[in-house]
Design a protein with these regions (language model features):
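Extended, structured polyanion-binding interfaces
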Residues: 1-187
Length: 187
């Protein structure tokens, strides 16, 4: 089940809900770790994945390091970064996972700020290598995840389309209508 919305920059943004086989509904933490990572890979062993995490999956810098970050609300990160170090993945009492974020020595420098595992947005290594784009992967074992997805289906319009065109020297020239759907499908 999925929905695709268009954000203000005009690019498509997908929310995808994948249903697992019933035998996978209550996994062990190790099962979650096989699918989702919230750690910086070892650059010596997984250099390509390390570079993709650096490019696409690091949150911030924000907090005291950058109070002007867009995620900052009342001097706190609205996405709750940096997360806490956790030596193993656990599922809390509400059924939400707290991903493994060990305090290893792997770091990434972004805008002159050293970031560690506490700043990694959860990802799936296979999807990140294949699509080379930001893909926030979350383990959901709740009915609320279906409600979350339907919120986006029924969310109404919140988009802008802009186009830069050469200026018309003749102000009386008839402008041709713009077929935005065709432009999107042709790109």
């Amino acid at each position: 089940m999925y929905t695709i919305e268009f954000q203000k920059r005009g690019l498509p943004h997908a929310h995808i809900l994948i249903f697992l086989h019933p035998s996978s509904k209550y996994p062990k933490p190790e099962d979650i770790d096989d699918i989702i990572s919230a750690e910086i890979p070892d650059p010596k062993k997984q250099n390509e994945l390390y570079n993709l995490v650096r490019s696409h999956m690091m949150h911030g810098p924000c907090g005291r390091a950058r109070l002007s970050s867009p995620c900052m609300k009342n001097n706190k990160c609205s996405k709750f970064f940096p997360k806490k170090y956790t030596e193993q993945t656990v599922v809390d009492q509400d059924g939400y996972p707290v991903y493994k974020r060990s305090s290893n020595t792997h770091t990434i420098v972004k805008n002159g700020i050293v970031l560690d595992n506490r700043h990694v947005v959860p990802y799936n290594g296979h999807l990140l290598l294949k699509y080379q784009a930001h893909i926030n992967m979350e383990w959901c074992n709740q009915n609320s995840s279906i409600k979350y997805l339907f919120k986006y289906i029924h969310k109404g319009y919140d988009r802008i389309t802009a186009r830069i065109v050469p200026s018309q020297h003749n102000a009386r020239a008839v402008q041709q209508p713009i077929d935005e759907i065709k432009q999107y499908l042709d790109c």
